[in-house]
């Protein structure tokens, strides 16, 4: 990537907008692609994304664009902040334009039909692209408001990691690198499920002991599942694992937490999602994770319990009673780290 080339951000949501602004603050020309011409015009005229980051001033170096072809042709470094459900349909027609380019996924989700992570879908669509992911305890509004933040860029491509670090690293945003792309991305996707549970617990005033128990048992479940799929367990002790889990399960700014909180207040799932007005990836992830955990025979009682509440007609009190009556096992599973870097 040359200094003259603009950096592309695909997606007009809160996180894509925060990253676009951050890139601009670091001196890059940024082209942010979005589907909605009205949204693009609002950003162009008012320098604000009113739907997703209201009150945040968007820098003049960020150019909102609706012509995807032009954006892809002009950029070598492309951050992909598209909803998991839209990634294939948006990018599949543009394979030739993406070959050899650096594609960095910002989306924390899992494809329902295949249980593939976003970077795996990118690899499938564009085998000749250079693929990475960015994940960590990164609430979009806090990034935009310059709260001190750290994240992880993960790829087997060391040069890509260095490019992303150089592009994003700044006064309030620190970028670490990892070669465990699968583990980093899986951590970002799985924690969304547990944020829904945490939001419900807060709405029901369950107490600090309960919240602490939920977060630590969630980390155990996440790690157990991830290791069964080949991830490095040590990744889950870092920013993309426990770091992301803590912030997502503790902050009312988290979209998945907000859905859980609304459910705890008595709203239906449809009502909670409608109130949010954005995609909450944890709801979709829960469905596919429950099936996958059964398929690979990994014990995930919190996942099973939340699924029972949202999709099987069970009440929260029934699920809590079943969870507390289950036989307690070891606190921390022993996982050999032999063979991991």
Curated annotation (Swiss-Prot):
Main enzyme class: oxidoreductase
BP term (GO), one: glycerol-3-phosphate catabolic process
Pathway connected to this protein: Membrane lipid metabolism; glycerophospholipid metabolism
Substrates-to-products reaction catalysed: sn-glycerol 3-phosphate + NAD(+) = dihydroxyacetone phosphate + NADH + H(+); sn-glycerol 3-phosphate + NADP(+) = dihydroxyacetone phosphate + NADPH + H(+)
HAMAP family per record: NAD_Glyc3P_dehydrog
Similarity annotation: Belongs to the NAD-dependent glycerol-3-phosphate dehydrogenase family.
UniProt-recorded name of the protein: Glycerol-3-phosphate dehydrogenase [NAD(P)+]
Taxonomic source organism: Pseudomonas syringae pv. syringae (strain B728a)
């Amino acid at each position: 990537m040359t200094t003259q080339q603009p950096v592309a951000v695909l997606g007009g949501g809160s996180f894509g907008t925060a990253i676009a602004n951050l890139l601009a603050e670091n001196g890059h020309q940024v082209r942010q692609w979005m589907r909605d011409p009205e949204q693009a015009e609002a950003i162009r005229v008012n320098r604000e994304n009113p739907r997703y980051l209201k009150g945040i001033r968007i820098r003049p170096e960020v150019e909102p664009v609706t012509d995807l072809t032009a954006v892809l042709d002009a950029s070598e470094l492309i951050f992909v902040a598209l909803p998991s459900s839209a990634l294939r349909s948006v990018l599949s027609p543009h394979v030739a334009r993406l070959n050899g380019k650096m594609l960095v996924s910002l989306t924390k989700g899992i494809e329902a039909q295949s249980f593939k992570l976003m970077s795996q879908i990118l690899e499938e669509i564009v085998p000749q692209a250079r693929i990475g992911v960015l994940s960590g305890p990164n609430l979009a509004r806090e990034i935009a408001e310059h709260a001190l933040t750290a994240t992880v860029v993960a790829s087997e491509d060391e040069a890509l990691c260095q490019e992303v670090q150089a592009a994003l690293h700044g006064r309030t945003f620190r970028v670490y690198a990892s070669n465990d792309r699968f583990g980093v991305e899986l951590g970002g996707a799985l924690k969304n499920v547990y944020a829904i549970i945490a939001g419900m617990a807060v709405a029901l005033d369950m107490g600090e002991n309960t919240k602490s128990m939920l977060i630590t048992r969630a980390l155990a479940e996440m790690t157990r599942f991830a290791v069964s799929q080949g991830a490095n367990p040590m990744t889950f002790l870092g920013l993309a694992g426990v770091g992301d889990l803590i912030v997502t399960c503790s902050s009312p700014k988290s979209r998945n937490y907000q859905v859980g909180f609304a459910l705890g207040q008595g709203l239906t799932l449809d009502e909670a999602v409608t109130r949010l007005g954005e995609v909450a990836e944890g709801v979709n992830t829960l469905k596919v994770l429950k099936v996958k955990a059964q398929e690979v025979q990994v014990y995930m009682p919190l996942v099973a319990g939340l699924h029972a509440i949202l999709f099987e007609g069970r009440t929260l009190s029934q699920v809590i009673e079943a969870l507390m009556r289950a036989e307690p096992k070891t606190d921390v599973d022993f996982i050999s780290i032999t063979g991991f870097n």
